[in-house]
Regions:
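Conserved HGGG/HGGXW glycine-rich cap/lid loop of the alpha/beta-hydrolase fold
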Residues: 7-71
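Conserved acidic catalytic loop of the alpha/beta-hydrolase fold
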Residues: 82-100
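Conserved hydrolase catalytic core segment
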Residues: 98-138
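Helix-rich cap/lid subdomain of alpha/beta-hydrolase
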Residues: 129-197
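Short beta-strand/loop motif that positions the catalytic acidic residue
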Residues: 211, 217-219
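Post-His helix in hydrolase/transferase enzymes
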Residues: 230, 252-268
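Catalytic NTP-binding/metal-coordinating core of nucleotidyl cyclase/transferase enzymes
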Residues: 273-351, 355-356
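Catalytic beta-strand-to-alpha-helix segment of the class III nucleotidyl cyclase homology domain
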Residues: 337-440
Length: 440
């Protein structure tokens, strides 16, 4: 979807960028200093937002000099705010873009505002998402904002900081690892300290009255780190700016699960009409079941008896799905794929199926995982479905095998588990800790 990383020349420095295919308008994601354009388009947490944004324009990511894949700079020669803004010009010129929408996140607002004020003819619109003018000002913020810098320094490179500032973002070890990798490729821990000191001194209040482009200021109502007062000040200082407060606690408006209201505001602001955003991603528990030794049994029983047994098996499975409010997605010969909106009910349904089919003289295996699924009509897809299938493939006769993600969601339910160790799941990155249900 996105181009390979390419380079634009900003003075003597090369600025790395990636772009999606051309669209109706160009939308530049103005980065703060701790992102990496090589990684950010691939983050699992932002795929829904990216798909929506690329439906209304070409999305362009780039890295400021001294960060990510752009040229490094010495600690005593850090780029100025003006040079950061010039990076936008360099990328635009390289792409042949005459006018762009600027989408600026938190501290990136400073360079975006300077560009918009100095290059109004090349700025179609300015969007500030959890932006601020000067971080050291007294906005009446709570104690959480004071802890952000310290947390960033101590957690950098682990990915955990992203969960601290985005507490509503779905989280597991794979998501953490994806953010950790981006942090490590963005800047080093030593550079974090230098950049924090630099950006803490930025103040663009004086610039904002000179911003004469359409401006949309979006802010989450319960962001404890960059409070709504910071966003309101931006809207107050920019002539005719529109301020919209949205529900949510995340610092990033482009991550799950709250990106949709933000995107709808952006789409309406840019296109003049409200975008319809399909709620095509849901958190669900997926259950895979299949009959153990089905090929051998089919050969021994013959077609007629085997099909009769399959019909009886299918009736048992569907009865239990109805009992535990599961949704049948598909069948494949001797197996079922179903989804549940409750993880405990999914496990208990798998146990009930396992126990009930024994009266038919057969054994089943079951694998379960909880994760975000893509809804495609009556079908589902996404990495969570692949994980569930791989977990099921590792289950033995009469096993109900679950991922650690699912096990963690049912602690306190009375269900007991047997540790089955860590495993590589084919086609899925990382190691996965699996557990077998050990309850009667």
């Amino acid at each position: 979807m996105f181009s390979e990383t390419r380079y634009a020349l900003n003075g003597d420095l090369r600025v790395a960028y990636r772009a999606s295919p051309p669209g109706e308008r160009d939308i530049v994601f103005v980065p703060n200093w701790f992102t990496c354009c090589e990684i950010i388009p691939e983050l699992p947490s932002i795929q829904g937002w990216l798909e929506a944004m690329t439906s209304i324009g070409r999305v362009i990511f780039f890295d400021h000099p001294g960060t990510g894949a752009s040229d490094p700079v010495a600690p005593d020669a850090l780029p100025t705010l003006e040079q950061w803004a010039d990076g936008i010009t360099a990328v635009m010129d390289e792409l042949g873009s005459s006018e762009v929408v600027l989408y600026a996140v938190d501290g990136a607002f400073a360079s975006a505002a300077l560009f918009a004020a100095t290059h109004p003819s090349r700025t179609a619109a300015l969007i500030a998402a959890e932006g601020y003018t000067d971080p050291l000002a007294d906005y009446g913020q709570g104690p959480e904002s004071e802890k952000a810098g310290e947390a960033m320094l101590t957690m950098w490179g682990t990915g955990q900081f992203q969960h601290v500032v985005n507490p509503d973002m779905p989280w597991n070890d794979d998501i953490r690892a994806s953010w950790a990798r981006m942090e490590r490729l963005a800047v080093s821990p030593a550079a974090v300290e230098v950049m924090l000191a630099l950006t803490s001194e930025l103040n663009v209040r004086a610039v904002l009255p000179s911003v004469r482009v359409p401006t949309l200021v979006l802010h989450h109502r319960d962001d404890a780190f960059i409070t709504p007062a910071m966003g309101k000040l931006i809207a107050d200082l920019i002539p005719d700016a529109k301020y919209v407060e949205l529900p949510g606690r995340n610092m990033y408006q482009f991550v799950e699960p709250h990106w949709r209201p933000s995107f709808q505001q952006i789409a309406e602001f840019l296109t003049g009409h409200q975008a319809e955003v399909a709620d095509d991603r849901v958190l669900a528990t997926v259950l895979f079941t299949d009959i153990v030794d089905s090929t051998r049994m089919a050969a021994e029983l013959g077609d007629r008896n085997w099909h009769a047994l399959l019909d009886a098996h299918d009736a048992v499975v569907r009865s239990q799905l109805a009992r535990f409010r599961g949704r049948e997605v598909s069948t494949s010969g001797d197996g079922f794929l179903a989804t549940f909106d409750g993880p405990q009910r999914a496990i208990r349904c798998a146990m009930a199926i396992r126990d009930a089919v024994q009266a038919l003289g057969i054994e089943v295996r079951a694998g379960l995982h909880t994760g975000e699924c893509e809804v495609r009509g009556d079908d589902i897809g996404g990495i969570a479905v692949h994980i569930g299938a791989r977990v099921s493939a590792l289950a033995g006769p009469n096993d109900v095998l679950v991922s650690s993600t699912l096990r963690d969601l049912v602690i306190g339910s009375g269900l007991e588990f047997e540790d089955r160790g860590t495993h590589q799941l084919k086609g899925v990155p990382g190691e996965w800790h699996l557990f077998a249900v050990d309850s009667p």
